[in-house]
Amino acid sequence: MAPAKKGGEKKKGRSAINEVVTREYTINIHKRIHGVGFKKRAPRALKEIRKFAMKEMGTPDVRIDTRLNKAVWAKGIRNVPYRIRVRLSRKRNEDEDSPNKLYTLVTYVPVTTFKNLQTVNVDGN
């Protein structure tokens, strides 16, 4: 049997989820909307991008930039791009009466090719 853990051994450090950070990701939309009907593809793609941002950044408040919306809808409701490069920025909420201290802003990053792209941390600017 594994030894029992003692209750009072928690570290008192800042959680990384409270840090303000910006990262660039490539999202494979194609696998996320596989099997979705034609008239629901672009709306579902935006929902999946929102879900991805929620999972990666850990904030329930996700805001999608209008340029990203236009990029997803550029080829119509049916023909959504296979992949998309996005910048996720976890930011402090200026609105005091909001229940969430942080929100995630998702912006579009235009790229010519998706070959050899990694997830990268971007300096906060």
Swiss-Prot record:
GO MF, one annotated term: structural constituent of ribosome
Localization (cell): Cytoplasm
GO biological process, one term: cytoplasmic translation
Keyword match Transport: no
GO cellular component annotations of the record: cytosolic large ribosomal subunit
Entries under Gene3D superfamilies matching the protein: 3.10.440.10
Role: Component of the large ribosomal subunit. The ribosome is a large ribonucleoprotein complex responsible for the synthesis of proteins in the cell.
PANTHER family xref list: 60S RIBOSOMAL PROTEIN L31
Descriptive protein name: Large ribosomal subunit protein eL31
Source organism of the structure: Pongo abelii
